[in-house]
Amino acid sequence: DIATDARPEQVHKLFRNCRLIGRRFRLAHVQFGQEIVEVATFRGQSGDGEDGDGPGVERTASGRILSDNVYGNIEEDAWRRDFTVNALYYDIDNFVVLDYVGGIADLKAGLIRLIGDPAQRYQEDPVRMLRAIRFAAKLGFRFDPATEAPLHRLGNLLEQIPAARLFDEVLKLFLTGGAIQAFELLRHYRLFGWLFPATERCLNHQQQHYPKTLLVRA
C-alpha cells in the first residue's frame, strides 16, 4: 500500500498500532480503525544469486529467495518489483505517478510483463507465476512473450512453496474475480496439476468433458 525510505523498525516506532511481519521481506502493518495499511521499505539491488548477493540475502540452490532485506531508493525498488504494471508509484507531495520501468505503457496496452529475466524472476519466487495468471485473468491482459515462455516448464517450482502461502494465493486466484479465466489459464500453462493433482488426473480422463463442465459451471 505504501512504500517509503524509512526502515521497518523506524515505522514501528512511529505508530502505536504497528507490527512487523515477514521473513523473506520485512514489512510493517499499521492498523487504522478496521483497515491495515502495509508499509514496505524501498528495496535495493540484491545481486544475481551467483556471486553478487550481499548480506541480508538468502537463497535456495534453485535460486528461490528465502530472505532479502537489502534496502535502497525508489528507483531501485521499482526494478525489484515483479511486473511493470505493479511498479507504479504515486507521489503524494507532487501528485504525480512515477514510472521507472514502462508500467504505464504496458497498462495502456493491457500487457503483463516481468521486470528482468523472466525465468530468473520465477525461480526467485515461483508464486509470481500464479500472480501473473491472476492479473491476466482478472484484468483481461495478455502476456508479454518473454514473460509467458517459462510458464509452461516451471510449474514444478511451486512444490517449493509452503502450503499456507499457496493456499492464500489460490484464494486470490478464485475469489477476486476472473475465476473461470484463471482456471483455464492454469490448465493451459500446466500449472493446475501442481496445485490440484487429484483434480488434474480426473480432468485428464474426462468423458464428454463432464468434469471440466462441472467445475466451470459450479
Each PLM stretch: what is its role?
Residues 1-218:
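Catalytic cores of the polymerase beta-like nucleotidyltransferase superfamily
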